[in-house]
Amino acid sequence: MTRYVFITGGVVSSLGKGLASAALAALLQARGYRVRLRKLDPYLNVDPGTMSPTQHGEVFVTDDGAETDLDLGHYERFTGVPATRADNITTGRIYLDIITKERRGDYLGATIQVIPHVTNAIKEFVLDGNEGYDFVLVEIGGTVGDIEGLPFFEAIRQLGQELPRGQCAYIHLTLLPYIPSAGELKTKPTQHSVAELRSIGIQPDILLCRCDRPIPREERRKLAQFCNVRESAVIEARDVASIYDVPLSYGEEGLDREVLALFGIEATSEPKLDRWRTISERVKNPEGEVSIAIVGKYTGLKDAYKSLIEALTHGGIANRVKVNLEWIEAEIFEREDPAPFLEGLNGILVPGGFGQRGAEGKIRAARYAREKKIPYFGICFGMQMAVVEAARSLAGIPEANSTEFGPTPEPVVGLLTEWMRGNELERRVAEGDLGGTMRLGSYTAKLAPDSRIAEIYGGTAIAERHRHRYEVNMAYRERLEARGMRFSGLSPDGLLPETVEVEGHPWFIGVQFHPELKSRPFEPHPLFKSFIGAAVVQSRLV
C-alpha cells in the first residue's frame, strides 16, 4: 500500500520545504522503506529552464533531460535516487497540456474549468507511477495563501477525501519567529497560517516548526491546542550548522516516528543513521581547509549554484577539509587585475552560465589559473572560456571567440545544431524557441585512456548530464593540442569535445557537462573529490 504525505509551507517562503521533504525521505529510507519524492510548482512557467537564475535559483537537470526545480537536487542528494521529469510539474505545464487537449477537441466541447479539469490533472500527476513505493512525499511550492497555489491545495484536499482512510497525511512547515524585546518565540503567525490552511479544507497532522532556539513546553501546548494537532506532532525544526545535520535533528525530534504513527505503523526499531553521523562528524571536524574562488555571473544569489556548492562540500568531506568559497563576480575582472582577488587561493572554479556579460572576466580567470599553476575547474561555459583563452594565448588566434556573443572570424565555440541522443539525431536552429531546446540530460562520453580525467574517473566510459547550446569547435583541435590543451574526452561519435585538460599543469580540467548534478554526500563526484584534493596540495605550497 502506498501512503501519501503532502508537505506545505506557511508564514514565509524559503523555509526549506525541499530540505524537510528530503530529510524525511532519508529517515524513512533508513527504516527500510521505499520512498518517492515529487514537487508541485505553482508558477506559470512551463519549467524553470528560461527563468533567471537570480530569481529562481539553479535549474536542476535530470538524466532524462528535464529542467526542474532545485529541490529535486536535494531529493537526489539525500536519497541517492535519481529524479525524473515525472517528479516535477508546474501550473504552466498543466495549463499547456489542458489547452492543447482542448484545442484538439479531447474534452468534447465541455467548459474547461479549474475544478475539475486543473485539479484532476494535478491529482493524476500525484498518483501516477507510484507502484512499489511505500511512501510518496509531495512538496507543494510556495506558501499557503498564495493565489497561484490554490488549485494545488484544492487538489491535495480532494485526495485526502478520495484516498482510502489511513493513506494520506499533511505536514505543515512554518516559522516561529523570536522577538528579542519580548524574549520569546511567537506562535501567532503559525496559528494564522494553519487557520488559512484549514479554511481551504486541509487540517495538518504535523507541524514542523522552524526556530532558532528550543520551543518551550508551554508554546508546544499552545500550538497543539490552537492548531488542532497532538502535542507530539509539534516537531521542532531548529537551525543546524549543516544541511546534512537535518535528518539527524528531525530524527531526534521524532518526525519519522510521528509520520509512521499517523499511518498506524509501529516503529519497532530506530532508523539506521550511522552514515549520516559520519558525514556530520566530518563536516564539523575537518582536518584542514582550502579556499576556492567561484568566478561566476549570478553570485548575487547563491541558490543559482546550489548543486555546485554541495558538490564542493562533498569534495571537502572526501578530503576531510573545510571548503571556504570566495565569490567573485566575473565582470570585475573585465576592469581590474585578477591577481589581488585570486592570490593565495587554492583553486579557481568557473561555472556554467549564458551570455556575454562577464565572459572576458572568466577568460582572464582561466588565464591566471593556467599561468600561475593554480588548480582550475571549468564547467560548461567555464570550459568554453578556458578554450577561448588557450586559443588566444597559446595557439596564436587573437580573435578567437564564441558565436554566442555575435559573429566572429574565429568561432572556437559555436552553436550546437545537431547531436546524437542514443541512435536518434536531434537538431536545433538559432531562430528556435529557447525553452527546452538545449542539449539536455545524460549523455555518454569516451575518455582518452592515458588522460588525467580518465585516471580520476577510473575508466574511459562516463555518462554525465548536459545543459548547453554551444560547443567547442573540433576544427581547432589540432592547433590547440599542439599547444598543450588536450581534447581528452569526446562524444561516442567523436564529433563533440566533452572534456579538455592542460598538459603539464597540476590540475586544469574543463568539462562540457555538469558533474555537480550527480554528486552525493555519500558518493562525492570523482572530479570534485580530485579538484579539492589538488587544492589541498596547492594549500601546502602557498
Curated annotation (Swiss-Prot):
Residues noted as binding ATP in the record, renumbered to the chain: 14-19, 71, 238-240
Residues reported in the UniProt entry to bind UTP: 13, 186-191, 222
Pfam families reported for this sequence: CTP_synth_N, GATase
Regulation: Allosterically activated by GTP, when glutamine is the substrate; GTP has no effect on the reaction when ammonia is the substrate. The allosteric effector GTP functions by stabilizing the protein conformation that binds the tetrahedral intermediate(s) formed during glutamine hydrolysis. Inhibited by the product CTP, via allosteric rather than competitive inhibition.
Stored InterPro entries: Class_I_gatase-like, CTP_synthase, CTP_synthase_N, GATASE, GATase1_CTP_Synthase, P-loop_NTPase
Family per similarity comment: Belongs to the CTP synthase family.
Name the UniProt record assigns to this protein: CTP synthase
Natural source organism: Methylobacterium nodulans (strain LMG 21967 / CNCM I-2342 / ORS 2060)
Taxonomic lineage of the native organism: Bacteria, Pseudomonadati, Pseudomonadota, Alphaproteobacteria, Hyphomicrobiales
Encoding gene per record: pyrG
